[in-house]
C-alpha cells in the first residue's frame, strides 16, 4: 500500500494518522517532491477507475492559470489533463491510496481510508 501525500494537507495527515492507528503497512510518497510520471498517473487513474479531470484540483491557482475548467473532458483531452497533472503535481487531488488488491482510492474521508484498508 502506498499513499500519495502533501504533508501540509490536513486530509493527508488525517489519512496517515488513521493508517497508523490501524497498524497498516504502507509507504509514503510525497508526490510534490517525488512527482509521478504521466505513466504512473495513468496507472493510478486505472486503479481508481477515474479520469484525470476527476482528480484535478481545479480551484488551485495553477489550474486557473492553465484554464483547465475550459478543457474538454473526454478521451481526446485525456492526455492533456495527464500531462498537466505530471507537470503541476499540486493539481493532483490528495491523498491517493493504492490498495494491495490493485485498486486505489482518494482518501479524503475516514470511510475512504478504511475502504482501502479492507481491500
Swiss-Prot record:
Disulfide bonds join 9-12. InterPro entries: Arsenate_reductase, Arsenate_reductase-like, Thioredoxin-like_sf. GO terms for molecular function: arsenate reductase (glutaredoxin) activity. This is Uncharacterized protein in glnII region. SUPFAM superfamilies: Thioredoxin-like (SSF52833). Keywords: Disulfide bond, Oxidoreductase, Redox-active center. Transmembrane segments: none annotated. Belongs to the ArsC family. It comes from Streptomyces viridochromogenes.
Amino acid at each position: 500500500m502506498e499513499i500519495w501525500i502533501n504533508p501540509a494537507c490536513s486530509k493527508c495527515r488525517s489519512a496517515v494518522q488513521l493508517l497508523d492507528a490501524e497498524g497498516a503497512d504502507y509507504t509514503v510518497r510525497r508526490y510534490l517532491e517525488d512527482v509521478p510520471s504521466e505513466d504512473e498517473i495513468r496507472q493510478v487513474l486505472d486503479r481508481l477507475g477515474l479520469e484525470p479531470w476527476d482528480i484535478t484540483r481545479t480551484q488551485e491557482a495553477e489550474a486557473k492559470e492553465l484554464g483547465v475548467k475550459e478543457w474538454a473532458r473526454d478521451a481526446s483531452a485525456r492526455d492533456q489533463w495527464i500531462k498537466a497533472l505530471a507537470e503541476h503535481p499540486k493539481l493532483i487531488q490528495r491523498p491517493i491510496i493504492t490498495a494491495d488488491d490493485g485498486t486505489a482510492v482518494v482518501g479524503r474521508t475516514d470511510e475512504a481510508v478504511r475502504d482501502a484498508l479492507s481491500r
